[in-house]
C-alpha cells in the first residue's frame, strides 16, 4: 500500500464568506479518505492568523470546523522561509472570497512550490471579477444581464447620479452586487431609490467596485464543470441543476442559501428540453475553456422560460462544498461520488504541479 499523501485542508479566512468556509471544510474533511491522505487541517481566523489542528480532534465536527480550540497550535504563518510551515505535498483550499479565490492564494502557493486544488492564478483572478468574467464568457455572443459599475472612489454626488442613471436605464427592480465576492454576500434586490441607495452603500463595504444590473426574469440554472483528466480533452460537464427560491427575499440570498435553506429547492436534474440542456452544457464547457480554468468551476446561468434565451450570470472557480452546495450535489447526481470527486480534483492538482515543476526557469 502506498504512503498517504500529506494534504493541508485550508479553511476560514479574512473574508465575508468565512462562515461558509467552515461548513464546506467540515464536509470535505468527512469525505476525504484518511487511508489515502494524511490530512492536516489549518484554519485561518478573521485576523489572518493560522492555527493547526489534529485531524482526529475534528472528526466529531459534522456541521462546521472550529477555527481555534484548546488543542490547536498557532502557526507563525502559512509559509516559513518561502515554504509551507508544515510538511505537505498539496493544499486543498476550502476558502472563499477575496485573497483566496482571486489568485492571491494561488500565487502564494506557486511561490512556495506546492500543489493546490483548483484554478490557477489567471483563471482565479478573472473568474472572481464579475465584470471581467462576463467580458470573456460573452465574447462569442452569449448574453448577460446589462449592468453598470461603480467604484468606492465615487463621492456622494457621483453615487447619487449613478443610482438615478441605472434606475432610468434598467428600471426596477435592480440587483446590487460586490464585483468580487460570492455566496451572495453583500447582494441586494432594490425595488426603489431608497433601497438602491442603501444597497449601494452596503455593497461598497465589501468590495472596492460593485455592479448594479437589470433584473432578468428567468430560471436560475447551475452546472458543475470538471477538467478532463485526458490531456487536451474537453471539460466534463454535470447534469443541469436548478435553484427554485421560495424565500421571502425573492432571490438566492445569503439567508436563503445558508440560514434558511429549507425555503429553497435544489432541483436535479432541471426539467429542460434536450436542445436547451445541450446548449447550457456547451456554454458551460466553453466558458470554462475561455477563462482557462483548471480543476473545477461552477457556471451559473439564467434562462428565460418563454424565449429560452440563456444569460450568463457568473462562474465560481472555488465553489462551496457544503452538504447543500450544488457543485458536489450535481456530480453525485451525475454519477461521481463525493470522495471520488475529491480524489479527481487532487489528482488534477498534482498533474498541474508536476507540469509547473518541469518548466525551465533558468535562462543562463
Swiss-Prot record:
Write out the pathway annotation from the protein's UniProt entry.
Cell wall biogenesis; peptidoglycan biosynthesis
Q: How is the cofactor bound?
A: Binds 2 magnesium or manganese ions per subunit.
Task: Locate the residues binding Mg(2+) 1.
Answer: 300, 314
Q: What is its EC number?
A: 6.3.2.4
Residues involved in ATP binding: 167-222
So which domain of life are we looking at?
A: Bacteria
Molecular function in Gene Ontology: ATP binding; D-alanine-D-alanine ligase activity; metal ion binding
Task: Give the catalysed reaction(s), semicolon-separated.
Answer: 2 D-alanine + ATP = D-alanyl-D-alanine + ADP + phosphate + H(+)
Query: According to the UniProt record, what class of enzyme is this?
Result: ligase
Q: Which residues form the ATP-grasp domain?
A: 134-347
What's a Pfam family this protein contains? Dala_Dala_lig_C
- What InterPro entries does the database record attribute to this sequence? ATP-grasp (IPR011761), ATP_grasp_subdomain_1 (IPR013815), D-Ala_lig_Van_CS (IPR000291), D_ala_D_ala (IPR005905), Dala_Dala_lig_C (IPR011095), Dala_Dala_lig_N (IPR011127), PreATP-grasp_dom_sf (IPR016185)
Q: Where does Mg(2+) 2 bind?
A: 314, 316
Localization annotation? Cytoplasm
Q: What is its main location?
A: cytoplasm
Q: Which cofactors does the annotated protein need, by name?
A: Mg(2+); Mn(2+)
Q: Which Gene3D superfamilies match?
A: 3.40.50.20, ATP-grasp fold, A domain, ATP-grasp fold, B domain
GO annotations under biological process?
cell wall organization; peptidoglycan biosynthetic process; regulation of cell shape
Keywords for the protein's UniProt record, in alphabetical order: ATP-binding, Cell shape, Cell wall biogenesis/degradation, Cytoplasm, Ligase, Magnesium, Manganese, Metal-binding, Nucleotide-binding, Peptidoglycan synthesis
A GO-annotated cellular component: cytosol
**Functional description taken from the UniProt entry:** Cell wall formation.
What family name appears in the similarity comment?
Belongs to the D-alanine--D-alanine ligase family.
The name this protein carries in UniProt is D-alanine--D-alanine ligase
Q: Where does this protein come from, organism-wise? A: Legionella pneumophila (strain Corby)
Amino acid at each position: 500500500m502506498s504512503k498517504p499523501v500529506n494534504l493541508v485542508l485550508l479553511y476560514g479566512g479574512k473574508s465575508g464568506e468565512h462562515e461558509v468556509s467552515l461548513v464546506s471544510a467540515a464536509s470535505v474533511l468527512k469525505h476525504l479518505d484518511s487511508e489515502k491522505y494524511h490530512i492536516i487541517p489549518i484554519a485561518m481566523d478573521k485576523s489572518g492568523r493560522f492555527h493547526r489542528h489534529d485531524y482526529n480532534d475534528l472528526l466529531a465536527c459534522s456541521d462546521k470546523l472550529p477555527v481555534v480550540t484548546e488543542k490547536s497550535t498557532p502557526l507563525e504563518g502559512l509559509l516559513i522561509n518561502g515554504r509551507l510551515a508544515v510538511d505537505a505535498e498539496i493544499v486543498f483550499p476550502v476558502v472563499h472570497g477575496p485573497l483566496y479565490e482571486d489568485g492571491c492564494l494561488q500565487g502564494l502557493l506557486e511561490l512556495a512550490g506546492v500543489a493546490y486544488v483548483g484554478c490557477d492564478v489567471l483563471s482565479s483572478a478573472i473568474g472572481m471579477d464579475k465584470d471581467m468574467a462576463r467580458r470573456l464568457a460573452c465574447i462569442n455572443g452569449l448574453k448577460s444581464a446589462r449592468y453598470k459599475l461603480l467604484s468606492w472612489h465615487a463621492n456622494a454626488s457621483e453615487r447619487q447620479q449613478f443610482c438615478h442613471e441605472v434606475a432610468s436605464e434598467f428600471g426596477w427592480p435592480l440587483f446590487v452586487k460586490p464585483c468580487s465576492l460570492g455566496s451572495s454576500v453583500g447582494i441586494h434586490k432594490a425595488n426603489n431609490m431608497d433601497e438602491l441607495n442603501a444597497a449601494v452603500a452596503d455593497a461598497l463595504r465589501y468590495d472596492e467596485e460593485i455592479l448594479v444590473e437589470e433584473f432578468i426574469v428567468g430560471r436560475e440554472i447551475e452546472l458543475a464543470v470538471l477538467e478532463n483528466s485526458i490531456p487536451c480533452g474537453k471539460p466534463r460537464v454535470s447534469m443541469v441543476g436548478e435553484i427554485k427560491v421560495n424565500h421571502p427575499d425573492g432571490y438566492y440570498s445569503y439567508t436563503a442559501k445558508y440560514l434558511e435553506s429549507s425555503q429553497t429547492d435544489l432541483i436535479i436534474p432541471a426539467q429542460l428540453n434536450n436542445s436547451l440542456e445541450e446548449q447550457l452544457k456547451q456554454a458551460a464547457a466553453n466558458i470554462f475553456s475561455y477563462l482557462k480554468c483548471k480543476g473545477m468551476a461552477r457556471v451559473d446561468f439564467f434562462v428565460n422560460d418563454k424565449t429560452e434565451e440563456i444569460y450568463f450570470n457568473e462562474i465560481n472557480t472555488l465553489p462551496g462544498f457544503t452538504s447543500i452546495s450544488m457543485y458536489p450535489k450535481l456530480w453525485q447526481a451525475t454519477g461521481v461520488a463525493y470522495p471520488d470527486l475529491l480524489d479527481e480534483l487532487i489528482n488534477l492538482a498534482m498533474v498541474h504541479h508536476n507540469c509547473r515543476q518541469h518548466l525551465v526557469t533558468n535562462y543562463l
